[in-house]
């Protein structure tokens, strides 16, 4: 079984979605179940509703899961496993207070050495009023694993101390809950971000202590860097939020396409999730950081907009009039996102805002003259744009740019874009609706 294990503590990051996509693909390729595990044991950081938001995003991206679990529902199991380790003398109670440990950390900092917990501190503050934590005994050997992307990764004994499994309130730490649940659900492969590399030896030690004989294969994905700044894409970067990308009009299929592409060898530029199932391989992923380029994402999104079938295009653009399908196709040629497409359609159908495009009093006057001329015309009486244009020029006595710019503003709400002769058939059929001025 493969799993995606998000925490409901904020917006879904593109790095998390990338990991979800890869776990989903490999699960499908290997005909194994795909598990979603909501890691909600940190009650203080959980944000209400974020779990449902994560699940909704996964559905939008085309990923269906075979099983959904909440980590907090397994807390009794986590405590049972901690008790097992205590009984087998693989774990111990530690009474050292937070204050004492902070002092030792400060001392290590002043002495310019890494802080390392010492087992001899465990009973220093033992008394009936002091509630202990549970720690796993530090190993006296190195911990190594073969990463599917990073190859061999090794941690020496001095890099690992006796770390906490259960806090004072008997809640499990992240690493303990994660390791226990991966055993419980028989997870065979974990694909996740490289920020989890330091967690891996701890989780391996926990699973070994619990008697696991089926080592998990790990694949740690390199970080995603912003191509412009060269810095890691953090939660402060708008474009790192999947929710933000969706709100900006990026199609789910394009986001998936892009996240599979970066840092990867792909056989073609434009593809769907289902198509990627046929050729995706972890072996083709680079060990170097991936680079996020919003301009290229827009390019891919433009390609996927053009691939939309008629029904989906009408649905996403929220247009009910099928007669406007051709117009939508014309507008797509100059739009990179669904948001841009909706804005184009909105400018076309809604009352025209002369004030917004105001240049000077002369421009305002020309718009007024041309508007009155157009209102007197029956657009459907003209066989083509050329005959319509000649009559509009004659009635308004305007020509050149004094005619064409106001004409574009009055008819499509934009001084640039699709050529008027191409769009004229749609203007003819909707002229009474579009030839209106904003109050």
UniProtKB/Swiss-Prot annotation:
GO biological process, one term: glutamyl-tRNA aminoacylation
Cell compartment(s), UniProt: Cytoplasm
Superkingdom of origin: Bacteria
Molecular-function annotations in GO: ATP binding; glutamate-tRNA ligase activity; tRNA binding
Keyword flag Cytoplasm: yes
Major localization class: cytoplasm
SUPFAM superfamilies in UniProt: An anticodon-binding domain of class I aminoacyl-tRNA synthetases, Nucleotidylyl transferase
Segments carrying motif 'KMSKS' region: 232-236
GO cellular component labels: cytosol
Family (UniProt): Belongs to the class-I aminoacyl-tRNA synthetase family. Glutamate--tRNA ligase type 1 subfamily.
Its biological purpose: Catalyzes the attachment of glutamate to tRNA(Glu) in a two-step reaction: glutamate is first activated by ATP to form Glu-AMP and then transferred to the acceptor end of tRNA(Glu).
Protein name from the UniProt record: Glutamate--tRNA ligase 1
Source organism per UniProt: Helicobacter acinonychis (strain Sheeba)
Gene transcribed to yield this protein: gltX1
């Amino acid at each position: 079984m493969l799993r995606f294990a998000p925490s409901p503590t904020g917006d879904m990051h593109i790095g998390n979605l990338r990991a979800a996509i890869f776990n989903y693909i490999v699960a499908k390729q290997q005909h194994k179940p795909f598990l979603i595990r909501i890691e909600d044991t940190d009650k203080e950081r959980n944000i209400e509703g974020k779990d449902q938001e994560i699940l909704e995003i996964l559905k939008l991206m085309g990923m269906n899961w075979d099983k959904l679990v909440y980590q907090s529902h397994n807390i009794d199991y986590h405590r049972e496993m901690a008790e097992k380790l205590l009984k087998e003398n693989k774990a111990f109670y530690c009474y050292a207070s937070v204050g004492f440990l902070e002092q030792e950390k400060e001392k290590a900092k002043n002495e310019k050495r890494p802080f390392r917990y010492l087992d001899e501190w465990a009973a220093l503050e033992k008394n009936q009023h002091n509630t202990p934590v549970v720690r796993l005994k530090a190993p006296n050997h190195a911990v190594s694993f073969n990463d599917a992307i990073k190859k061999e990764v090794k941690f020496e004994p001095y890099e690992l101390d006796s770390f906490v499994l259960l806090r004072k309130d008997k809640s499990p730490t992240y690493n303990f809950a994660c390791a226990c649940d991966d055993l419980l659900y028989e997870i065979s492969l974990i694909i996740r971000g490289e920020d989890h590399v330091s967690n891996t030896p701890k989780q391996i030690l926990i699973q070994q202590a619990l008697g696991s004989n089926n080592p998990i294969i790990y694949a740690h994905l390199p970080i995603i860097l912003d191509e412009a700044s060269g810095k890691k894409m953090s939660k402060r970067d708008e474009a790192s939020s999947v929710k933000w990308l969706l709100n900006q009009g990026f199609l789910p299929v394009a986001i998936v396409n892009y996240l599979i592409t970066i840092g990867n060898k792909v056989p073609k530029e434009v593809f769907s999730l289902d198509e990627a199932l046929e050729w995706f391989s972890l072996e083709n992923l680079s060990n170097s950081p991936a680079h996020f380029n919003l301009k290229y994402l827009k390019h891919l999104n433009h390609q996927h907009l053009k691939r939309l079938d008629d029904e989906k295009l009408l649905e996403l653009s929220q247009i009910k009039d099928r007669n406007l399908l051709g117009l939508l196709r014309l507008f797509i040629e100059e739009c990179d996102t669904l948001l841009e497409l909706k804005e184009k359609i909105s400018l076309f159908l809604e009352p025209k805002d002369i004030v917004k495009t105001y240049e000077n009093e002369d421009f305002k006057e020309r718009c007024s003259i041309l508007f009155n001329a157009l209102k007197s015309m029956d657009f459907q009486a003209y066989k083509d744009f050329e005959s319509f244009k000649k009559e509009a020029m004659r009635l308004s006595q305007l020509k050149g740019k004094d005619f064409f710019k106001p004409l574009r503003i009055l008819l499509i709400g934009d001084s640039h874009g699709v050529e008027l002769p191409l769009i004229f058939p749609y203007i003819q059929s909707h002229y009474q609706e579009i030839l209106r001025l904003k109050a």
